[in-house]
Amino acid sequence: MFKVGFIGTGVIFDLNILGYLNNPDVKITCLCNRTTAKAKEKVKKFNLDKNIPIYSDYREMLDKEDIDIVEILLPHQLHAEATIYAAEQKIKGISVQKPMALTLDQADAMIDACKKSGSILSIYENFLFAPHIKRAKELLEQDYIGDPSSIRIKTAMGGKGGWKIPISAEEWRRQPEKVGGAKRGSPVLFDNGWHDFVLAHWFFNEEVEKVFAWTGNSQGLDAPAYVMFKYKQKFEHVVPQYGNMEFSLLPEMEIPSNYYPTDEFIEIIASRGVMKINQGTSIGNKMSTSDIFAPIVIIRDGKVESYSDFEKDWKFSFINATNYFIDAIKNNKRPILSGEQARYILKFNLAAIESAESGKEIFLE
């Protein structure tokens, strides 16, 4: 049985912990949070061992506790140093919340440290394990709509509703040196937007040649924002492949959600059909229960098909992601978003931010 320690017990902890609670291969044996009272609240909330060790310093926890897996759920500027320290303690499995790091140099240092220690590094990406995303990917891999030529990912965010976010969590995301990205910080493109950059790469399995982006400045956020990109075409395709991401704010819309008041709507156009993914974190859950918007819709051969044969709740993306990571550690497998793969996503993301700041098209070399 693998012993697991958590560094950080903020809001996202409530989802990251779910996959560990009923998995027979693991046991949560220690927690760390700068404010230990918050960690104690989580012990009660999730019925953990009341005598579980709680630390305020992650270094002390990693020094004293004999653990096999560590979940790093810290503000972005701490990802690299915590990962490197965990690797130096030869922790077998290291899972890091997105984004991977603030810079490519930090990402390289994380990768090198884990290679040196033999640690398996994974950047946590629940979106790849969301049931509706997995189903959409399966349909693409089955060549059901032909060769994909374009992808559009539209993120709607910032509405009323959803769970309560502590002021402290909002505050550090408004500090450029902590959230990362642009000189004035990028809480949209670099934090929430990370998921979209991952999906753009994962759905097409192609690297990006160039990117152009524009960002506004509303409500202290780098939004609205628009990102356009062209794929390299490593493989032969029917037509050249392009994509775009759009980030819009809905400050007055009531968004029913058990989680963040945010959603991602995806459209993929291919040589023989079109796929529309309506399922999402919050609005998508409500929409997909209606007769109008099925979770996945495919238009092909003059017909419209819908798919809903999967779990809808966003929590399953976390449970699935964690179970996958545990299995990767158990069987010494390369994670789906390894350090090297996440470094590429970081490069793609930072290129878009550089474009927005410079007003120029950026090539990914």
Model-derived features: positions:
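Contiguous beta-strand/loop segments that form the cofactor/metal-binding neighborhood of enzyme cores
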Residues: D191, H195-N285, S317-N331
